[in-house]
Amino acid sequence: MVKAVVGANWGDEGKGKITDMLARKADIIIRFQGGANAGHTIVNDYGKFALHTLPSGVFYRHTTSIIGNGVALNIPVFINEIHSITDRNVPMPNILVSDRAQIVMPYHILFDQYEEERLGGKSFGSTKSGIAPFYSDKYAKIGFQVCELFDEEGLKGKLASVCETKNVLLEHLYHKPLLDVEELYATLQEYRDMIAPFVCDTSAYLDKAIKEGKNILLEGQLGTLKDPDHGIYPMVTSSSTLAAYGAIGAGIPPYEIRQVVTVCKAYSSAVGAGAFVSEIFGEEAEELRRRGGDGGEYGATTGRPRRMGWFDCVASRYGCRLQGTTDVAFTVLDVLGYLDEIPVCTGYEVDGTVTEDFPVTWKLEKAKPVLETLPGWKCDIRGIRKYEDLPENCRKYIEFVEAHIGYPITMVSNGPGREDIIYRQSAL
């Protein structure tokens, strides 16, 4: 059976923890899109880890972790992450890398930085991980697949052609140093040697695993609102963040995905620019940021303070719908225990009209939140294992959110650890 774990919102919802938890029963875990531009934090018996490329299953001996063909693979980051966990006594994980995955080139990171500099105040808030230039090249058909590292003659010729194009931009648009073909070729030979032990046809491997009845978990990055088609365009990432793309980015048939666990945070947070209707500011935001997440709400990749807001039913319902949600995992609920009252965004007012539908970007930028306030529970809920043992106002908050988003909340996370999870039967 194939399951997917994806985000409903801007990312940072807590997917890493949910994937880590579900990985106990998984045979294979796959990263199917994105690159090192977003991180996920995992707390387990080995300690606290912020991963950017490795799937969350690397902490289990029984799992195989796969980097799928849809991933933007930064090979040095990938290797360094393996070392970062094995240096902390995590056993060497079993990892496979798709021979069709494409490589983040050194110049992709440079072009990302140069473009942000050029745009100045109009920048997209990039993590400067090379993601947009990488995907631009992929779809312009001038990217490099992992398998091309093993075709020395073809690689050198293609590299010369691509560098010629890149150097025109470097000279005339960015006014930066030009690329050296020989230097890049030597770097790619190093990449080849680094990645060689992991490379295989992962699609064929997964086809065999599905036929054998293996439990397979697709691990998504970011969330619906960062999807290039359905997100808050252009403040989006460059690869699809939807569960549907899991089939493409892993190389499996779409009908094999039987369960989609969409992760929603009990409040909202976002990194980078763009419309954020339920956003809060000042001391109110700072306190939620300080108390939030695991050690504060700061980007796992950039360390930037996350923008904070109340739970947004409009955005979350939309996010769950686009993901094809079968189950909602509701995370970081324990963070809200300090509040006397908890506002929830249940609608948007756009040009004097209230809507519960998520609008296109230019309308979203004019939207004002319609808030309903619920009573808080004013206590620490960490350590509770049964839904009925949660405070009444806490249960009412969960049930209010569930009723407004229209998708069943079957898991509630009330702490950062693997054991901090409550399963519940939904009335939906």
Model-derived features with residue positions:
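Non-transmembrane, aqueous-exposed alpha-helical and coiled segments at domain scale
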Residues: 1-428
